[in-house]
């Protein structure tokens, strides 16, 4: 679902903005965020963005050639670098193209993880199934689970239906400790449709630029940050 991200990526433009950036982030998380994690995210943002730019990610610039910063949701200042309205696709495509060229990376497409291969309480690989229903295995010394969230389990979601939290289920099955799985990010604004399936995402940038949520009577019905 990284491909679907529209708005952009936050970055600390200036050290003088740290306090405001930190407060905006904590407020948006109802002050339940891990403060240390928020600090690391903000402090490392310039380095991360710099790396993405060096790798070829094309963030939008203004007529003077300077980066064009926009604003999202709870941010009081413009801190968002973006690529048109498809920032996630730009970043994902760029990184994927690089990964495909790496000799030490093997990409196995259209393959689903079915289970862990466990021996003596150590994960040694995974059982997988390809698009033709053929079962196989992939062995590895270390396993990193990066299968995304579980938004596809919900009736109304901007996630694709196959985003079902498979890694969480397998982790629980094999006794792997999980943390904070009660925090599920649901994108709050989508284009209304009577059709079943994934909803079209309306970016937080819309609210960042001043849009508000109204009911059918044209009345505000919520504080977007509550």
Predicted regions and their residues:
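A conserved beta-strand/loop capping segment in the N-terminal third of enzymes
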Residues: 39-77, 212
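Short coil/turn segments at secondary-structure junctions
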Residues: 29-36, 78-82, 151, 155, ...
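Gly-rich Lys/Arg/Thr-decorated short loops/hinges at beta-loop-alpha junctions or inter-strand turns
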Residues: 6, 32, 70-79, 147-149
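Residues forming the flavin
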Residues: 1-23, 61-63, 84-226
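Short amphipathic alpha-helical patches
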Residues: 32-33, 48-49, 75-76, 167, ...
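Redox-cofactor-proximal catalytic regions of oxidoreductases
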Residues: 1-57
């Amino acid at each position: 679902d990284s491909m679907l991200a529209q708005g952009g990526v936050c970055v600390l433009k200036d050290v003088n903005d740290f306090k405001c950036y930190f407060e905006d982030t904590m407020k948006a998380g109802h002050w339940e965020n891990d403060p240390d994690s928020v600090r690391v995210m903000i402090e490392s943002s310039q380095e991360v963005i710099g790396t993405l730019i060096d790798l070829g990610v094309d963030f939008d610039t203004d007529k003077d050639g300077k980066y064009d910063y926009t604003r999202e949701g709870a941010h009081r200042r413009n801190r968002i670098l973006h690529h048109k309205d498809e920032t996630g696709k730009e970043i994902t495509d760029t990184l994927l193209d690089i990964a495909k060229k790496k000799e030490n990376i093997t990409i196995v497409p259209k393959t689903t993880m079915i289970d862990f291969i466990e021996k003596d309480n150590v994960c040694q690989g995974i059982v997988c199934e390809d698009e033709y229903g053929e079962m196989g295995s992939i062995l590895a010394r270390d396993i990193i689970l990066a299968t995304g969230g579980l938004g596809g389990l919900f009736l109304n979601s901007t996630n694709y239906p196959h985003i079902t939290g498979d890694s969480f289920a397998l982790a629980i099955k094999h006794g792997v400790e999980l943390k904070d799985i009660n925090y599920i990010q649901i994108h709050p604004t989508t284009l209304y449709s009577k059709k079943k399936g994934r909803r079209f995402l309306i970016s937080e940038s819309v609210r960042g630029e001043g849009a508000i949520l109204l009911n059918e009577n044209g009345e505000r019905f919520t504080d977007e940050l509550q």
